């Protein structure tokens, strides 16, 4: 990829505009989960070290475009960054007509979604943003799949457009996992619906040696194998699609195994009583919430022998401990594996945290939708723009 990297540029006395993904949960004016903010710090610190005047922008939440709403202000992020960087950080509300920023200083722009035209990648807005800087740095993998003014348009018109270290790491890790994977390659795809992950399943099924499905997705495959799923979440209209995916996998010498044992309950609640059953014994009143220990052990063996592991989605309702053993065993197997492993998606990251394996996963992707679209083989607009500007 012919992308210019920020690390290679001379930024001395340059006005540098960095698009980060600082979209974090905020409660009562305080950031409640700082993973994305922590991930952005090295890029901001590097720009300062290189002698730049630093401007940072991001979206936060989903405010009505073009309207200021204090609930979605970047102020809590500014407070956090000032502490973390140990230097004054200013919030700038009106920045489109010019910003006073000195070398060695950091300013944060107010929520980019307060600008009319952000979502539609408006040309006039993009040009105004581009005029603020000498160098534009795209460092927000989490929004790389969206062609918006702050992620795409600004980079088209900026004097120089480059990738920040965080984005570069992400693209390198995903490339390593997908373009030239160590074999055997195993993908674990969980989540509630086949429909939202169908293109991911199709794309991965042509690349991987073993595809593992979990969560509500697995229920549709269980139904496709001819078993009852009771009152479980599944998609009857996609049973034929599931059969086709299994047949395709088998024709290439692989498989998409369905669980042999499952954990069921009669209701979805934190206090629901869990019962272990053979998949053949599921009744009409059962709801499947996890894979059983035999299935988890079989999948763990597959994972432990892998050369590359891609994990997107839990295999059960792990938020409730009685339905978390399957996901826990999968997490342990990934942690114990010598394979190159990459995990992404919100629920997956929550599982990584819950089972304390973050330091055992080779790479944790910060992008939810962008991670999925990369797995689907789709072109990410922000990345395509950077390639064009680097050519």
Swiss-Prot record:
Binding site for ATP: 197, 319, 345-348
Pathway listed: Carbohydrate degradation; glycolysis; pyruvate from D-glyceraldehyde 3-phosphate: step 2/5
InterPro entries named among the record's database cross-references: Phosphoglycerate_kinase, Phosphoglycerate_kinase_CS, Phosphoglycerate_kinase_N, Phosphoglycerate_kinase_sf
A single GO molecular function term of this UniProt record: ATP binding
Swiss-Prot/TrEMBL GO biological process terms: gluconeogenesis; glycolytic process
Keyword ATP-binding: yes
Gene3D superfamilies from the UniProt entry: Phosphoglycerate kinase, N-terminal domain (3.40.50.1260)
Secretion signal span: none
Residues given in the record as substrate binding sites: 21-23, 36, 59-62, 113, 146
Catalytic activity entry: (2R)-3-phosphoglycerate + ATP = (2R)-3-phospho-glyceroyl phosphate + ADP
EC number: 2.7.2.3
Subcellular compartments: Cytoplasm
Single GO cellular component term: cytosol
UniProt KW Nucleotidyltransferase keyword: no
Keywords: ATP-binding, Cytoplasm, Glycolysis, Kinase, Nucleotide-binding, Transferase
Subunit structure: Monomer.
Family that this chain belongs to: Belongs to the phosphoglycerate kinase family.
Protein name: Phosphoglycerate kinase
Species this chain originates from: Shewanella frigidimarina (strain NCIMB 400)
Source organism phylogeny: Bacteria, Pseudomonadati, Pseudomonadota, Gammaproteobacteria, Alteromonadales
Gene name of the record: pgk
């Amino acid at each position: 990829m012919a992308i210019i990297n920020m690390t290679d540029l001379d930024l001395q006395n340059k006005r540098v505009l960095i698009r980060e993904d600082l979209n974090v949960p905020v409660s009562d004016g305080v950031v409640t989960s700082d993973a994305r903010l922590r991930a952005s710090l090295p890029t901001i610190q590097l720009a300062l070290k290189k002698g730049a005047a630093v401007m940072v922008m991001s979206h936060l939440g989903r405010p009505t475009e073009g309207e200021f709403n204090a609930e979605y202000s970047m102020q809590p992020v500014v407070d956090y960054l000032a502490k973390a960087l140990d230097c004054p950080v200013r919030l700038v509300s009106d920045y489109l007509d010019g910003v006073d920023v000195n070398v060695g200083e950091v300013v944060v722009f107010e929520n980019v979604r307060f600008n009319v035209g952000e979502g539609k990648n408006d040309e006039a807005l993009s040009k105004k943003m581009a005029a603020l800087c000498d160098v534009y740095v795209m460092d927000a993998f989490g929004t790389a799949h969206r062609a918006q003014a702050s992620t795409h348009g600004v980079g088209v018109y900026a004097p120089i457009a480059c990738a920040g270290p965080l984005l570069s790491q992400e693209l390198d890790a995903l490339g390593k996992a997908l373009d030239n994977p160590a074999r055997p390659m195993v993908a674990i795809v969980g989540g509630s619906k086949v429909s939202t992950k169908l293109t991911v399943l199709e794309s991965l099924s042509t690349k991987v040696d073993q595809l593992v499905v979990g969560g509500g997705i697995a229920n549709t495959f269980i139904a496709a194998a001819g078993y009852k799923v009771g009152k479980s979440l599944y998609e009857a209209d996609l049973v034929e699609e599931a059969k086709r995916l299994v047949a395709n996998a088998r024709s290439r010498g692989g498989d998409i195994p369905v669980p042999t044992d499952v954990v069921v309950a009669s209701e979805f609640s934190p206090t629901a009583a869990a019962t272990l059953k053979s998949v053949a014994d599921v009744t009409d009143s059962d709801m499947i919430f996890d894979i059983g220990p035999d299935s988890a052990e079989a999948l763990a063996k597959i994972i432990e022998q892998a050369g590359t592991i891609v994990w997107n989605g839990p295999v059960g309702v792990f938020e409730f401990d009685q339905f978390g053993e399957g996901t826990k065993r999968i997490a342990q197997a990934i942690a114990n594996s010598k394979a190159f492993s990459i995990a992404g998606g919100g629920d997956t990251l929550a599982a990584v945290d819950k089972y304390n394996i973050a330091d055992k996963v080779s790479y944790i992707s910060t992008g939810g939708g962008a991670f999925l679209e990369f797995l689907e083989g789709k072109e990410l607009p922000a990345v395509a723009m950077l390639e064009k500007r680097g050519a």
